[in-house]
Curated annotation (Swiss-Prot):
Monomer. This is Methionine aminopeptidase. InterPro entries: Creatinase/aminopeptidase-like, Pept_M24, Pept_M24_MAP, Pept_M24A_MAP1. CDD domains: MetAP1 (cd01086). The gene is map. Its cofactor is Co(2+); Zn(2+); Mn(2+); Fe(2+). One of its GO terms (cellular component) is cytosol.
Amino acid sequence: MTCIFIKNINEINKMRLVGKLVADVLDMIKEYIVPGITTEELNNICHNYITYKQHAKPACLGYQGFPKSICTSINDIVCHGIPNKNSILKNGDIINIDVAILKDKYYSDASKMFFVGKPTELGKKLCYVAKKSLYLALYTIRPGINLQKLGKVIQNYVKKQNFSIVKEYCGHGIGRSFHEPPQILHHNYYKSNTTILQSGMTFTVEPMINSGSCEVQCTNDGWTVKTKDKSLSAQYEHTILVNEEGCEILTLQKGEQISRILKNLT
């Protein structure tokens, strides 16, 4: 039987702290995302901010051999893009920056999309749908519901928008370990999940949405995942705490207003 860790108040407070650090990095990096900058430069800015300003550790660096401190996934890259000096942002790109931090023995993890210059209409719509699919799932969370319901909510919304959901990657429990049980599926194709949400659970929700086919492939570097048909992909991610009222978003960023996005639930 899978052991899901329920956090006590001391653990929750530590996760609130590290969650805020993650949110602060995503707020900080926005001004640097301009045409002409390399993803290597973005990585170095985040690494230095986490290490020297926040006095924390970039959790991605060295994790199962990952060589950088953040993931940078541009356009048709679904996830786990490796920052490098030859990857130069250009006008119209969409980029996901994924930040995970370890502080005082606890982890937090979040990602968001950024526009480089002026985005295409497809890029704008895809990012909006990816963000809203995450928010709809977060709005659904409360103690006593089956975890499977989150995937169903995401799937129903994304399908109506004529986009597709990546099935190979999922959210995860998080706390003293970077990845803990349970797995958080962003679809409802596997209907055997019996996990019931409880107050004190902490996990990530991180749907990856493609503008074309849901099929993906891993490149030769062993990390970078791309859409098979070269269509655009977008992802938003938060670390959350299940509480008696629903959930607390531990990685909420400045000015982020979920209610505004959820006004139109179609």
